[in-house]
């Protein structure tokens, strides 16, 4: 059972801004209800400007959290877009590998980069939720489906099975205090959807936000990101992808179809689709471009035998499950479940 949680801001420093304090307070009250001890790492609440200017401070927080034997779980506050800037401070002198201990690490979105860092040093992690977007949900409570998996992770330190949500929620556009207690609009959901290939397959899941993976290869957003990712061999090799299950989900930026195609093409050229046993696709926010994305997946992958399963409740569309990386997963679309060894 998780007893001590450290919250880190490895990307954008939203948690330290005044405009987010009502959300932080909500989240802390909910965590208190679990009976866990919560600490913000020293730089986690220093705000957007400071953390943007000081990636070394973000890296220091992560290293300190791993080195502290009293911390059971590292919970990311939120994503962002520049956590790649931590790479030199975590790998130049093998700092991360020497610091890592067996703790639960949970985050998503830009935290995809941190998951790849931790995969590189051999730590299994958990993808799918974060403090501000999930624990600090402005409604009367955490979204029930989201809460179910968060609770399981806190109580057991793992996730044993994932099934689809009965509903999906419209994304919020207003995070002001006026929205406290107001639940997001809900719609019936359709379960896991088999786009192509066998309905059953297995392997260790690895992946994350496709927008972030695009930036691994393309320097339009940050010119030095592809350079640093290559320097530190951050993107897994084709051999590393062999036998795994690729997870892809889209961000709140609602990636345009032409960029989605380009991102898939980068992954294809890296040998990912030839190596993996299957692909899992998270539901897009508000289901925007859903059908176009499916068409592009079929076209770019160009292998009808490779299983592709869509409409998972993972990533930027609410509610969110949690998927373990680094443990064997068995996907069964007919039974509508993913089980973990």
Task: For each feature predicted by the language model, list its residue ranges.
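Conserved anion/nucleotide-ligand pocket segment
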Residues: 124-211
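Long, hydrophobic/aromatic-enriched structural stretches that serve as scaffold segments
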Residues: 67-91
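Short, acidic/small-residue loops that bind anionic groups at enzyme active sites
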Residues: 92-120, 124-133, 307
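ATP/NTP phosphate-donor binding region
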Residues: 1-70
């Amino acid at each position: 059972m998780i007893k001590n949680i450290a919250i880190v801001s490895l990307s954008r420093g939203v948690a330290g801004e005044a405009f987010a304090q009502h959300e932080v307070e909500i989240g802390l009250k909910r965590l208190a209800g679990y009976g866990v001890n919560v600490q913000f790492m020293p730089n986690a609440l220093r705000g957007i400007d400071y953390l943007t200017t000081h990636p070394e401070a973000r890296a220091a927080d992560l290293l300190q959290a791993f080195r502290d034997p009293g911390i059971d779980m590292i919970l990311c506050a939120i994503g962002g877009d520049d956590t790649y800037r931590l790479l030199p401070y975590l790998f130049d002198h093998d700092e991360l590998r020497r610091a890592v201990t067996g703790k639960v690490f949970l985050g998503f979105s830009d935290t995809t980069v941190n998951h790849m860092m931790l995969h590189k040093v051999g730590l299994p992690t958990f993808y799918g939720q974060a403090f501000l977007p999930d624990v600090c949900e402005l409604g009367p409570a955490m979204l029930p489906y989201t809460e179910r998996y968060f609770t399981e992770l806190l109580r057991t330190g793992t996730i044993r099975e994932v099934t689809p949500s009965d509903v999906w929620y419209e994304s919020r556009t207003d995070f002001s205090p006026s929205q406290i207690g107001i639940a997001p609009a809900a719609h019936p959901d359709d379960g896991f959807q088999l786009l192509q290939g066998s309905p059953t397959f297995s392997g260790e899941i690895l992946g994350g936000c496709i927008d972030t993976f695009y930036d691994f290869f393309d320097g339009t957003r940050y010119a030095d990101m592809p350079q640093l990712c290559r320097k530190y061999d951050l993107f897994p090799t084709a051999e590393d992808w062999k036998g795994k299950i690729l997870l892809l989900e889209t961000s709140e930026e609602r990636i345009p179809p032409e960029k989605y195609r380009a991102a898939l093409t980068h992954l294809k050229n890296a040998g990912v689709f030839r190596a993996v046993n299957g692909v899992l696709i998270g539901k897009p926010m508000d289901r925007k471009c859903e059908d176009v994305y499916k068409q592009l997946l079929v076209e770019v992958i160009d292998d009808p035998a490779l299983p592709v399963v869509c409409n998972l409740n993972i990533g930027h569309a609410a509610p969110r499950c949690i998927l373990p990386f680094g443990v064997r997963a068995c996907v069964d679309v007919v039974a509508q479940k993913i089980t973990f060894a």
